[in-house]
Swiss-Prot record:
<protein>
    <recommendedName>
        <fullName>Superoxide dismutase [Mn]</fullName>
        <ecNumber>1.15.1.1</ecNumber>
    </recommendedName>
</protein>
<feature type="binding site">
    <location>
        <position position="164"/>
    </location>
    <ligand>
        <name>Mn(2+)</name>
    </ligand>
</feature>
<dbReference type="InterPro" id="IPR019833">
    <property type="entry name" value="Mn/Fe_SOD_BS"/>
</dbReference>
<comment type="function">
    <text>Destroys superoxide anion radicals which are normally produced within the cells and which are toxic to biological systems.</text>
</comment>
<keyword id="KW-0479">Metal-binding</keyword>
<comment type="subunit">
    <text>Homodimer.</text>
</comment>
<dbReference type="InterPro" id="IPR001189">
    <property type="entry name" value="Mn/Fe_SOD"/>
</dbReference>
<dbReference type="InterPro" id="IPR036314">
    <property type="entry name" value="SOD_C_sf"/>
</dbReference>
<dbReference type="Pfam" id="PF02777">
    <property type="entry name" value="Sod_Fe_C"/>
</dbReference>
<dbReference type="GO" id="GO:0046872">
    <property type="term" value="F:metal ion binding"/>
</dbReference>
<dbReference type="GO" id="GO:0005737">
    <property type="term" value="C:cytoplasm"/>
</dbReference>
<keyword id="KW-0560">Oxidoreductase</keyword>
<feature type="binding site">
    <location>
        <position position="27"/>
    </location>
    <ligand>
        <name>Mn(2+)</name>
    </ligand>
</feature>
<dbReference type="InterPro" id="IPR036324">
    <property type="entry name" value="Mn/Fe_SOD_N_sf"/>
</dbReference>
<comment type="similarity">
    <text>Belongs to the iron/manganese superoxide dismutase family.</text>
</comment>
<dbReference type="InterPro" id="IPR019832">
    <property type="entry name" value="Mn/Fe_SOD_C"/>
</dbReference>
<feature type="binding site">
    <location>
        <position position="168"/>
    </location>
    <ligand>
        <name>Mn(2+)</name>
    </ligand>
</feature>
Length: 202
């Protein structure tokens, strides 16, 4: 088996005017594609690894041979992180969570606005490249951030929502205005997908 880019559930321009077409196309066809290519190269001599879902690989890095562990961490993480990212974006997104996820967010963080403020702060404070996440850890929601392409899965945490704060995710449209990009993210969040991920992780 070889790892492949997931099919985008929308066109490159579908998230306009929030996320621009050029960034989406470059992000998917160049950046994500490179992670997939490099991951396939890393595991090419290890067919037993290539049979595993990428999420399983990054969740169990200790079982990856040491000579390719760094490559799998970086490129496998990049593949897993971006695959989730595309799925939790939608041209019909925005609004607020519903159901059990809404209740869990309010229980853990206060109001939805309180949650967004805390998530935004984590995303803005990540120095350099990385991600901000809403994760399930031991049945409870947490907000965490990771460096580079590190995945919460590697720490035993299941991501429900993730935001890429690498400059390649926003610089063409937002330049150095990361907080504006973070605010815009909420307009395109696919809460139906986040709900499904939360239900599966509980």
């Amino acid at each position: 088996m070889t790892y492949e880019l997931p099919k985008l559930p929308y066109t490159y321009d579908a998230l306009e005017p929030n996320f621009d077409k050029e960034t989406m196309e470059l992000h998917y066809t160049k950046h994500h594609n490179t992670y997939v290519t490099k991951l396939n190269e890393a595991v090419s001599g290890h067919p037993e690894l290539a049979e595993k879902p990428v999420e399983e690989l990054v969740a169990n890095l200790d079982s990856v041979p040491e000579d390719i562990r760094g490559a799998v961490r970086n490129h496998g993480g990049g593949h897993a992180n971006h695959t989730l990212f595309w799925s939790i974006l939608s041209p019909n997104g925005g609004g607020a969570p519903t159901g059990d996820l809404k209740s869990a967010i309010e229980s853990e963080f206060g109001t939805f606005d309180d949650f967004k403020e805390k998530f935004n702060a984590a995303a803005a404070a990540r120095f350099g490249s990385g991600w901000a996440w809403l994760v399930v850890n031991n049945g409870k929601l947490e907000i965490v951030s990771t460096a580079n392409q590190d995945s919460p899965l590697s720490d035993g945490k299941t991501p429900v929502l993730g935001l890429d704060v690498w400059e390649h995710a926003y610089y063409l449209k937002f330049q150095n205005r990361r907080p504006e990009y973070i605010d815009t993210f909420w307009n395109v969040v696919n809460w139906d997908e986040a709900n499904k991920r939360f239900d599966a992780a509980k």
